Swiss-Prot record:
One of several proteins that assist in the late maturation steps of the functional core of the 30S ribosomal subunit. Associates with free 30S ribosomal subunits (but not with 30S subunits that are part of 70S ribosomes or polysomes). Required for efficient processing of 16S rRNA. May interact with the 5'-terminal helix region of 16S rRNA. The gene is rbfA. The keyword Cytoplasm applies. Keywords: Cytoplasm, Ribosome biogenesis. Monomer. Binds 30S ribosomal subunits, but not 50S ribosomal subunits or 70S ribosomes. The keyword Cytoplasm applies. GO terms for cellular component: cytosol. One of its GO terms (biological process) is maturation of SSU-rRNA. This is Ribosome-binding factor A.
Length: 133
């Protein structure tokens, strides 16, 4: 139980530190000025590697390009984050996309379709009532 609690604490510290590094220190053009959220970090049991799950707000550059830039900058990000989170061995960072924006976009498009259908039905009902008058 204590190991689980310790692991959660280390994951949270890594998440916060990696987010700070990406926000303040990374100068890659496909990373800086992007809305990147570190949704969670999952450290391996041997503490040698960490899965870093990110959510990237859609932008003119594709999310895949931004993810590729994060992967390319993983060494730099780990080096900078290791100054903040002191561990015996700092884990290798592996970035993965966690798409939290798609469900919202999908719901928004469904609502727009419903609104369009409602307009059509209202328009058709108005036309049919005019014919009967």
């Amino acid at each position: 139980m204590t190991e689980n609690r310790r692991m959660k604490k280390v994951n949270a510290m890594l998440r916060e530190s990696i987010a700070k590094v990406i926000l303040k220190d990374v100068k890659h053009p496909k990373i800086s000025n992007r809305w990147i959220t570190i949704t969670r970090v999952s450290l391996s049991r041997d503490l040698q590697s960490a899965r870093v799950y990110v959510s990237i707000m859609p932008h003119e550059n594709s999310q895949e390009e931004t993810l590729a830039a994060l992967k390319a900058s993983a060494g730099f990000i780990a080096c900078q984050a290791s100054k903040d989170v002191v561990l015996k061995y700092f884990p290798d960072l592996n970035f993965y996309m966690e798409d939290i924006f798609s469900p919202q976009d999908h719901i928004e498009s469904l609502l727009l379709k419903i609104a369009e259908q409602d307009k059509k039905l209202t328009h058709n009902n108005n036309n049919s009532s005019e014919l009967h008058d």
